[in-house]
């Protein structure tokens, strides 16, 4: 005998299967319209939610690209801050009174250091790296200032009395906090 079904057997097999249950009552046209309108409203809601999700995803991606562009140089800029500090120290090491007595070679060297420091600071600011304000008398802000000492000074209590190392920001982030001494007020 073969395993293949004969045409008569297929009809017998199909006869044993119950046909799908038909709804007991058929929908009226009005009920069908109401049901289809509800499905349409549900689908429209789903589409609106998907469009809102798509828009939010696009905005989030744009924001992440913008932040990546701004903060991509953060580590490199932080490494350059010590170069800026050293150039400033080199310039501060020579008092103004002694600058007049320099030889031509010394004046050229000093001019080169000044130009290098200026160009470095210009390049940093061009890329959004800016100094943190930390002048004596300014209000101490723990978000951008690091207090390394408290000293009596003519400045009001809680304000900056002295700047030890300049701070820098890139965008909204503090790249390096300014190291300052905070005033305790005038000495009694």
Swiss-Prot record:
Pfam families cross-referenced by the UniProt entry: GrpE
HAMAP family the UniProt entry points to: GrpE
Cellular component GO terms held in the UniProt record: cytoplasm
Listed InterPro entries: GrpE (IPR000740), GrpE_coiled_coil (IPR013805), GrpE_head (IPR009012)
Protein name: Protein GrpE
Oligomeric and partner information: Homodimer.
Keyword terms, alphabetized: Chaperone, Cytoplasm, Stress response
Principal localisation: cytoplasm
């Amino acid at each position: 005998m073969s395993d293949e079904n004969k045409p008569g057997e297929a009809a017998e097999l199909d006869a044993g299967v119950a046909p799908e249950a038909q709804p007991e009552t058929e929908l009226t046209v009005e009920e069908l319209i109401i049901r289809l309108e509800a499905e349409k409203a549900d689908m429209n809601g789903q589409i609106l939610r998907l469009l809102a999700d798509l828009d939010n995803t696009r905005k989030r991606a744009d924001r992440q690209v913008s932040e990546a562009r701004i903060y991509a140089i953060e580590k490199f800029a932080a490494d350059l801050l010590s170069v800026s500090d050293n150039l400033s120290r080199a310039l501060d090491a020579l008092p103004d009174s002694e600058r007049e007595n320099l030889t031509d070679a010394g004046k050229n060297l000093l001019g080169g250091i000044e130009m290098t420091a200026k160009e470095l600071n210009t390049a940093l600011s061009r890329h959004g790296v800016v100094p943190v304000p930390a002048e004596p008398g300014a209000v101490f802000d723990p978000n951008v200032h690091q207090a390394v000492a408290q000293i009596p000074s003519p400045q009001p209590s809680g304000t900056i009395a002295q700047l030890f190392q300049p701070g820098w920001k890139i965008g909204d982030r503090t790249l390096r906090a300014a190291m300052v001494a905070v005033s305790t007020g005038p000495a009694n």
